[in-house]
């Protein structure tokens, strides 16, 4: 474009009406961000590859992986450098615009010059404004030249700044024939599986009639089933000698546990164990304590034993034994007495537990009847003669 052929109104108007340098500044920031991301990605790739190859993944497969990924890492580094260059060029283009904008004549000045020229020409009746008109025209020519020079400089600077090196596409990290090889392997595997299935079905169909014929012969089937495999015979011969040991060590404890459970159930039904037995057991110590506490102190003596015939008795037996029934007419039983009363039983003795002794014979006076009404026997009084 020939900027010298355009008036200053056009050149200045374009510079002031455009978007300015903001888009170029934003583009420079975006290129910087892309360059930083590519650099970080390249460093991460190299770190992971180094760790895998030297520590965790060794062998030919690891080497092939490194050889496949190395070109891609190099491309990322080269692309990051190109992105940084693009950012620098965008900044240079923005700077060129700012320089041209500062050198261009502002449109208001151009408009004022044109307005003054129009006024001078209008009032130049006698030629008195000829010099002023020439000066105004010269000033306008300078504005024209200034705008043309600024635009030419801006065009050259922006052309250099916007010349970006084309970016190379990323390298292919896989073999071009890998897809075809994979498809061929899948097809071969599918064909092999289908062929194996078909052969298995054909074999099954071929053996099916013989199997059905064998099932129709019960005797042959039984004989075939009775044939013991060798491994089963070996297991039986190995297990029989130690089967009794397994029964004694494993079965008998369970048998004893079953007997114990049965006995516990029976004792609980009889009341020997359970809540009632627990209450009786809890009351037993108190009863024993009361019995022990009620006994008197231990005493001993010599020559004080009571006698029954030639038999000597302990002193407390005499008190524990019941009184003998008195005879009628004896000194101990007056004739005026009422029925014979049975003495109260004394405290239990130590040896025989207070067992009553046999009473003496009462044949002389007789004894009262033990049932019905008792007859009262009275002696003859002295005053009766």
Curated annotation (Swiss-Prot):
Gene3D superfamilies: PPE superfamily
Origin superkingdom: Bacteria
UniProt xrefs under Pfam families: PPE, PPE-SVP
InterPro entries cross-referenced by the UniProt entry: PPE_C (IPR022171), PPE_dom (IPR000030), PPE_sf (IPR038332)
GO BP annotations listed: response to host immune response
PANTHER family associated with the record: GLUTAMINE-RICH PROTEIN 2
Note: Was identified as a high-confidence drug target.
UniProt similarity note: Belongs to the mycobacterial PPE family.
Official protein name in the record: Uncharacterized PPE family protein PPE22
Organism annotation: Mycobacterium tuberculosis (strain ATCC 25618 / H37Rv)
Taxonomic lineage of the native organism: Bacteria, Bacillati, Actinomycetota, Actinomycetes, Mycobacteriales
Gene that encodes it: PPE22
């Amino acid at each position: 474009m020939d900027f010298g052929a355009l008036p200053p109104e056009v050149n200045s108007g374009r510079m002031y009406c455009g978007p300015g340098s903001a888009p170029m500044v934003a583009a420079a920031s975006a290129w910087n961000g892309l360059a930083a991301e590519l650099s970080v990605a390249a460093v991460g790739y190299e770190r992971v590859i180094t760790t895998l190859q030297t520590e965790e993944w060794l062998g030919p497969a690891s080497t092939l992986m490194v050889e496949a990924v190395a070109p891609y890492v190099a491309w990322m580094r080269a692309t990051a450098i190109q992105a940084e260059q693009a950012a620098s060029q965008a900044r240079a283009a923005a700077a060129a615009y700012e320089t041209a904008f500062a050198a261009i004549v502002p449109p208001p000045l151009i408009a004022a010059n044109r307005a003054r020229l129009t006024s001078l020409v209008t009032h130049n009746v006698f030629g008195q404004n000829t010099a002023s008109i020439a000066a105004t025209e010269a000033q306008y020519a300078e504005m024209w030249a200034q705008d043309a020079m600024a635009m030419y400089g801006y065009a050259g600077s922006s052309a250099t700044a916007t010349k970006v090196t084309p970016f190379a596409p990323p390298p292919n990290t896989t073999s071009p024939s890998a897809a075809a090889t994979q498809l061929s392997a899948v097809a071969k595997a599918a064909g092999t599986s289908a062929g194996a299935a078909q052969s298995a079905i054909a074999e099954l169909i071929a053996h099916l009639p013989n199997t059905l014929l064998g099932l129709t012969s019960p005797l042959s089937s039984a004989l075939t089933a009775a044939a013991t495999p060798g491994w089963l015979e070996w297991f039986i011969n190995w297990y029989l000698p130690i089967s009794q040991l397994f029964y004694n060590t494993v079965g008998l404890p369970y048998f004893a546990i079953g007997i114990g459970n049965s006995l516990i159930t029976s004792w609980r039904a009889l009341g020997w164990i359970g809540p009632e037995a627990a209450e009786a057991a809890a009351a037993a110590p108190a009863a024993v304590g009361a019995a022990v506490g009620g006994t008197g102190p231990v005493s001993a003596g010599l020559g004080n034993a009571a006698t029954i015939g030639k038999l000597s008795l302990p002193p407390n037996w005499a008190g524990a034994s019941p009184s003998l029934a008195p005879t009628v007419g004896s000194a101990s039983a007056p004739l005026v007495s009422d029925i014979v009363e049975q003495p109260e039983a004394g405290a239990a003795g130590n040896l025989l537990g207070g067992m009553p002794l046999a009473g003496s014979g009462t044949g002389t006076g007789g004894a009262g009847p033990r049932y019905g009404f008792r007859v009262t026997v009275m002696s003859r009084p002295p005053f009766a003669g």
